[in-house]
Each structure stands twice: as C-alpha cells, then as structure tokens.
C-alpha cells in the first residue's frame, strides 16, 4: 500500500512538473505594457523575388507564439518546394498564381488523356487530364476489356508519358491557404504583377516538436544568406536537404546516375529559393475555381488526400457582417474549412470605409496577429491592467499582435482599410464591449448603474444606444432623437 501511495505521489509530481514546464516555458512573456506596429526585420533576396521575415523574438510575437513571413514572387517566379515543422496559415494579399502541395497520397493529376493503365504499369492510379483519382474506379471495366486496356497502355507508353503529379490549384487575391506541418508546398506566379503571400507559423502548436524557431526545410535550391530566423546561429548558407546525402546514396534511391544526383544537390546554385522560370511552365492546370460548381461539404468525407485547404475571403456576398456604407467582415474557421480543426488556426478578413469603426472587442480564446493589406487605421489596444498599450496608426504592410483578452478598437482613417487577422484557435470567439450583442448589453441596468456610479437613465443609454453588433460610424455620437433600425 505504501509503495502504491509513493508511486501515485511520484506520478502526480511528474505530471505537475511536465505541465508546468510546458505552460510556463516562457514565464511572464505576455506581461506587455507596450505594443508596436512591426515591420520585417530580415530580407532574403532571391533571383525572382524575396522573403521578408518578422523577428519572432519580438515580445508581442513571442507572447502569441507565432512567426510571420511575407513572400514576394515576381512574374514567372517559382518558390521552390519547402516545408515547416509548424502548422501554417497563408493569405494571398496580392496577385494570382499556382500552388501545389505534396501529401502522402498517390498522384492525381495526369497530362495524357489517351493513357490507360496496363496491368504492369506503375501509373495505375491515372485518371485522365486534370482529374483526380480517388481509388480504383477506373482500373478496369470488366474482364472482357483487359486486353484492350493493355493495348492502349502499350500504345500510350510508346507515344511517351509526360507527367503526373499531385493537385495544383489556382490561387488569387483573398485566398486563405491552410498547410499541415511537414507538407511540402510550392508557388508559381503566372500573372503580370507580383504575387504577395503572407504566412503565420504557429510555433507554440502541439504539432511543432522542435523549439520556438521557424525552421524551413528546402527540397530544392539553396539560401546563400542562411537561416536569419534563428537568433544566435552563425549565418552560414542553408542548403536543401538533398545536399546532406552523398551522391551515391541519392543515385541508388532515385535509380539515377551520380552526375544527376549531384545536380539535385544544387551545390553551385545561388539563385535562392525563388527562381525565375525560363520558357513555358507546363503543369496540369485545373479549371478556375469560379468555373467549378459549388458543393456542400460537411468535412466527414474528407481525407488527408482530398481535404480542401483553400477558401477565399474577399467576396462580400459571403461575408459574416456586411454594410454597404461601412464595409464587411468575413471569418474562416473549422466549420468552413475542416482542415483548420487539425491546425488549430483560423482567420478573419476585414474591409471598412473611412470613418467606419469596428466596435471594441477582445478575443476570448485566441491570440491574434493583424496584418494590414491596404490603407490605414487608428487602433487602440488595452491590456489586463486597463492600460492603453497601443494607440496609433497602422498602415499597409505593418503587423500588430493582439494577445488573448486584450481589447481592441479599429477606425479607418484612409478611404479604405483592409486587413487579415490570423488567430491561434480553430474556432476563435470574440466578445464585444458595446453593441447589440455586447457584454454590457447583457448586464442588468442596476449592475451598470452601481458599477460605474451613473444614473439609471445614463446606464440605459450606455446599454441601448449602440444597436449595431460589429461595425458602426465613428463620425460622432449616435442620435438620441428616436429609435434606429438595427443592422449589423
């Protein structure tokens, strides 16, 4: 009995220690008395673009447990495939292009419409040009057709089989892209203007088994400037992961000659991680998303191979809050994009006109990182001590981190203010201070009157004068002349 009691005591002590070491890895990191609008601290230049990195050691980003990166890809620029050890949520701030991800699934895009799989073909999962293969539905149509299929397979192989690869998607301004840890991803700019993509990396995620440093793993190319993301590390050129293996091992693994294996290592390549494509970029391109019918999905049928990873937040007709004279706000969570349930991230897109204001609110269960894509706004943020830790302008290209529970209000000071917020919860929730669904609206008048030492009539005005839920005008106090029609 004594032995059992000692074992239980040891187990409880161990659990307490492990929980404490995890939860308090960075003690007092969120005792912030000042926030700042942040700019990139490092720039990695490449042949056809650049990668701009924010300092994730900045106190407000360290509190949120995230890192932030901006990719600027020039026309005909190809961001070479890479992966991170963290979950990543990206937003296309400008431009259009192509995106590919590689997960542990068979290739589903094939560029030869005449190809039919024969019995001994290694490409038995082919489904035709630009189509996705989901199983073995086209692997034979009965015993009587096997001979014909074999002949077709031999004919097509004689004609030459060009390529098959995993899914490629068109991306455009407003797209939000979710990416699992360890999933290789590439981008190509097939437009005429720069393709700008911003990404948040959840360093504090349970899926990141390394330290709180963003670590890109490159499958191709080299980074001559080294890993500027990791503080204290001597900046040596960062090579792709194939460079670490001997050419002989690569030759055996890929069934190629040693010379080709050496080329895979990119040892003499100083173009960086964004290279310029010479000539046409021939990949299998699916129909544009606007040409495909909208389908109702519940996420239950999705697998890692078929899961949607992209959704567009720039369509006002799909907004959660829309007022033509003020603007709109759209949210993206795991109900809209089920993959976010595993990433434990979500996003909010806002676009408001001059003098429109987002009513004071706080994130109940998430940290938020606000990135300005267009225009300017005046923002105030208040911490748990009731101190105003930020009171100033934010403008295009700047970043502001808003910790959980910190109250924030935004007012557009330019003709239009647009931003994207990344949040560290798959279903982030907000509470408002003013408005129809606010915390003060839910309190009894007596509580408001006694709590703020105001009359019942003043308490009634505090509680009921603002009938909007999210967006309102900031040009002056509301009119008290009569009832107003409630809207968003």
UniProtKB/Swiss-Prot annotation:
Single annotated GO MF: nutrient reservoir activity
Ranges where the Cupin type-1 domain occurs? 35-262, 311-460
Stretch forming the signal peptide: 1-23
Q: What are the cysteine partners in each disulfide bond?
A: 30-63, 105-305
Per the record, its GO cellular-component terms are:
rough endoplasmic reticulum
List all Gly residues biased stretches: 121-147
Q: What is this protein called?
A: Cruciferin
Quote the function comment for this protein: This is a seed storage protein.
Species classification: Eukaryota, Viridiplantae, Streptophyta, Embryophyta, Tracheophyta
The record's annotation in CDD domains points to:
cupin_11S_legumin_C, cupin_11S_legumin_N
- Tell me what organism the protein belongs to: Brassica napus (Rape)
* Location of region: Disordered: 116-163
Task: State its location(s).
Answer: Rough endoplasmic reticulum
- Which PANTHER family does this chain map to? 12S SEED STORAGE PROTEIN CRA1 (PTHR31189:SF30), OS03G0336100 PROTEIN-RELATED (PTHR31189)
Which family is annotated? Belongs to the 11S seed storage protein (globulins) family.
Q: How does it assemble?
A: Hexamer; each subunit is composed of an acidic and a basic chain derived from a single precursor and linked by a disulfide bond.
Tell me the InterPro entries matching this sequence: 11S_seedstore_CS, 11S_seedstore_pln, Cupin_1, RmlC-like_jellyroll, RmlC_Cupin_sf, Seed_Storage-Functional
- Which stretches are tagged as biased composition: Low complexity? 148-160
Q: Which domain of life is it from?
A: Eukaryota
């Amino acid at each position: 009995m004594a032995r059992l009691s000692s074992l239980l005591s040891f187990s409880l002590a161990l659990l307490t220690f492990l929980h404490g070491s995890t939860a308090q890895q960075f003690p007092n990191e969120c005792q912030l008395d000042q926030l700042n609008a942040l700019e990139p601290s490092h720039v990695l230049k490449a042949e056809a673009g650049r990668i701009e990195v924010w300092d994730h050691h900045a106190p407000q980003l360290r509190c949120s447990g995230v890192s932030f990166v901006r990719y600027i890809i020039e026309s005909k620029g190809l961001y070479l495939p890479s992966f991170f050890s963290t979950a990543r949520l990206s937003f296309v701030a400008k431009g259009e292009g192509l995106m590919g991800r590689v997960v542990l699934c068979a290739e589903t895009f094939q560029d030869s419409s005449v190809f039919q799989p024969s019995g001994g073909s290694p490409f038995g999962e082919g489904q035709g040009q630009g189509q996705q293969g989901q199983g073995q539905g086209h692997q034979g149509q009965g015993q009587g057709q096997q001979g014909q299929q074999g002949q077709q397979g031999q004919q097509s192989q004689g004609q030459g089989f060009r390529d098959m690869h995993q899914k490629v998607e068109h991306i455009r301004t407003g797209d939000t892209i979710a990416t699992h840890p360890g999933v290789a991803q590439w981008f190509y700019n097939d437009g005429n203007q720069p393709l700008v993509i911003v990404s948040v990396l959840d360093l504090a995620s349970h899926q990141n088994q390394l330290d709180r440093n963003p670590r890109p793993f490159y499958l191709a190319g080299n980074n001559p400037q080294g890993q500027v993301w990791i503080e204290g590390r001597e900046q040596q050129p960062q090579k792709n992961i194939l460079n670490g293996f001997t050419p002989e091992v690569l030759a055996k693994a890929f069934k190629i000659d040693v010379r080709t294996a050496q080329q895979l290592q990119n040892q003499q390549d100083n173009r960086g991680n964004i290279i310029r494509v010479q000539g046409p970029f021939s990949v299998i391109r699916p129909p544009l998303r606007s040409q495909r019918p909208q389908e109702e999905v519940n996420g239950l049928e999705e697998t890692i191979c078929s899961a949607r990873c992209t959704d567009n937040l720039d369509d006002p007709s799909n907004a959660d809050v829309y007022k033509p004279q003020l603007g709109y706000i759209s949210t993206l969570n795991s109900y809209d994009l089920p993959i976010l349930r595993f990433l434990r991230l979500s996003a909010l897109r806002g676009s408001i006109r001059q003098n429109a204001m987002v009513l004071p609110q706080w994130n109940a269960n998430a940290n938020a990182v606000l990135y300005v894509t267009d225009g300017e706004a005046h923002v105030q943020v208040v911490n748990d001590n009731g101190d105003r830790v930020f009171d100033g302008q934010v403008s295009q290209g700047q970043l502001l981190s808003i910790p959980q529970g910190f109250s924030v209000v935004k007012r557009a000071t330019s003709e239009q203010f647009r931003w994207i917020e990344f949040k560290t919860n798959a279903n982030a929730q907000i509470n408002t201070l003013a408005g129809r669904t606010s915390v003060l609206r839910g309190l009894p008048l007596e509580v408001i009157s006694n709590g703020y030492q105001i009359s019942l009539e003043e308490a009634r005005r505090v509680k009921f004068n603002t009938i909007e839920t999210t967006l309102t005008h900031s040009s002056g106090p509301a009119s008290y002349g009569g009832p107003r029609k409630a809207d968003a």
